[in-house]
Amino acid sequence: MYKRQIQEYEALFDESTVFLVRSQGVGYAKPEEMINHGVTGPNVRAAGVDYDVRWAHPYSVYSELDWQPSVERSSIKGADCYDRYRVRVEEMRMSASMVLQALDKMPGGSETYHEPGDPKILAKAPSRAPEGTYGSHHFEDSRGESMFYIAGGGEGRGKMPYRVSIRSPMFITIPYAAKCMIGYKVADIPAIMGSFDPCIGETDR
């Protein structure tokens, strides 16, 4: 049903003259510029850059699933609003496929089932983060590459870490998206910014 709905929405947009006029040839973003600015995720894949953290550095169960990053082959000018729309449509299809594969591979039986709120499925936090210890991890979220860095604070801080640093993809992407508005009409700004899928809460962190 979900895949059928994607197809319906896709046809709705792709058959809309207004949508095509307002998205094609608008808000070009060059792949080399995005790489230099640190832009990741579907925005850079829309420009033909084949990079996805889940594919390049597999974690969790991604290596056990049959999938490939959704990458658009944009024009020499770079990716426009329509390219960014296209890559997200393909990502929805791929995500649905990955969820179905994960459900098929998920072990069954009463031993693996827990009621919502069961303490067995809740993460157990350590009593404290020892001083001098640290950890970092990067992963792919819906808008690009995220990274968390945590440094332990020792006994004096209880469970509170000494330092937490977050690298969110939108914090990097939004300043670059503003550059893509140069030379276009004021009326194009909502389409250009919206095509980058901004999240103000993530940007503010």
For the regions a protein language model found, what residue spans apply to each?
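Metal/cofactor-centered catalytic core regions of large enzymes
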Residues: 3-205
